[in-house]
């Protein structure tokens, strides 16, 4: 595992499983830089995202998902937006 600089994380809304629109106004295709724009992301979604982001940042992987990627849903059952977190390494 590379113990150097931590990768950047990009979070993108990729789908919606619930019947209602997002209360925070997020739409499919919205994308955020975790380091500079995380304050724009719904707190409920961030609560779900943080463990995935932490694992990606430190080189972990998830069963059934590509390396450097984590897909998860927000915890609002009425909305259930699907998010994709991606590890972005500087060249």
Residue spans of the language-model regions?
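Short, compact, well-ordered microdomains
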Residues: 59-91
């Amino acid at each position: 595992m590379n113990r150097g600089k931590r990768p950047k994380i990009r979070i993108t809304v990729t789908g919606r499983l619930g019947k209602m629109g997002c209360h925070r106004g997020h739409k499919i295709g919205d994308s955020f830089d975790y380091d500079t724009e995380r304050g724009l992301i719904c707190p409920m979604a961030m609560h779900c995202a943080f463990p995935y982001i932490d694992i990606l940042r430190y080189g972990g992987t998830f069963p059934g998902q590509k390396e450097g990627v984590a897909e998860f849903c927000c915890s609002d059952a009425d909305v259930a937006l699907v998010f994709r977190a991606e590890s972005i390494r500087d060249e």
